[in-house]
């Protein structure tokens, strides 16, 4: 019988730490439900003790997920473990994940303890977690730079204390494949009680080795891989879920293992994470990059036409990638739009059909032809002006010539009925529009990030603008999508300002409660 490798997804914990602006609870839940459909065995969804917001998002996800084990991170500290339990206890199935640093560098410089103390703390943490659940994972942080004797010692102690999964992370992406594989082999051979736990690996990609290290670890006895969608994560990122899963699937002859992942969901989840996290996917990224299945050289194209196996080791359909249909126009009905979304594997619960269809009609009128990737962008950027928004972009025009500075006219609708207008100059049309909007709202805002991405191809491609603005020490994220860059920039700022207004509203409600 083929051995199964457990896929532990940490997109919403280790992946989210790398983002410029935090995801909302709604966005996190959307990703968690997509991960559940993907078939991940375990999803790590936050660090509950770190903030009330993180605690609440872990609790919300724990309440909704039925077909995967939900876990949260905690240091080897009582209050962390207790907070993790309180957030997770509503889940159908949960795990507590606790960790402590084990390398000499961390033990001496960060913890300022002896290694004996660290082993004692690990044992106490695992025992406390076992009071709450039979499923406890222990990680020795920075194992890649820890001596093998110390790794074996702390792992044995953690298993004796009740750990059911022991994780050997290469926290700083320092190891090379043979070296890391050897660490796993030694843990497997030298720890006397290792048969009572699953060996897990968690690799970072600082030297580009995360996928290779994870696969080598599996060949040496690891049976859980910790990874993220698109490999997102701190610094150079984490092991990429899609890469390790497809490597084990395509090379099952060599690896001799499989996973529970429904690979046809990979493309969809990858796109969702990219858009919600504002993390573009490099075109030549393995498995999910836009060029991953493109064959532009004449020789390759000729071979592909004769027999696609000449240059293709897996079919695009395996990861849920379908050829784009070109038949969506302004004349297409709601059923056609819904049908295209269903073809891409989305359920009606994943998006608001009414809002999507309205946005689709506006885009189809401008563009003529609408592609599947356009629909995905419209469906999952939940920001084009909704009912609850205080501010709506009503009219916009911007002019710029070589001789004269740029000027912009902006009309906004405030609170559903009040029209406010401003005409002002700026250093280019986008700057002029931003000056006009800020002039109307009177908010003090500092732009800390502006990114423009083309969605689609050709002159009529959609321009997606992602911004992060700072207001009173807090960061707010805005996204705008339109065929015109100035319009998408304006929509992004209006989106961010609406988020600020919502934050003000929440603050007012809280203040009210305290008085």
Curated annotation (Swiss-Prot):
GO terms for cellular component: cytosol. Belongs to the alpha-IPM synthase/homocitrate synthase family. LeuA type 1 subfamily. Pathway: Amino-acid biosynthesis; L-leucine biosynthesis; L-leucine from 3-methyl-2-oxobutanoate: step 1/4. It is an enzyme of class 2 (transferase). Residues 392-515 are annotated as: Regulatory domain. It comes from Haemophilus influenzae (strain PittEE). This is 2-isopropylmalate synthase. Pfam families: HCS_D2, HMGL-like, LeuA_dimer. It comes from the Bacteria. Catalyzes the condensation of the acetyl group of acetyl-CoA with 3-methyl-2-oxobutanoate (2-ketoisovalerate) to form 3-carboxy-3-hydroxy-4-methylpentanoate (2-isopropylmalate). It catalyses: 3-methyl-2-oxobutanoate + acetyl-CoA + H2O = (2S)-2-isopropylmalate + CoA + H(+). Homodimer. The keyword Chloroplast does not apply. Its EC number is 2.3.3.13.
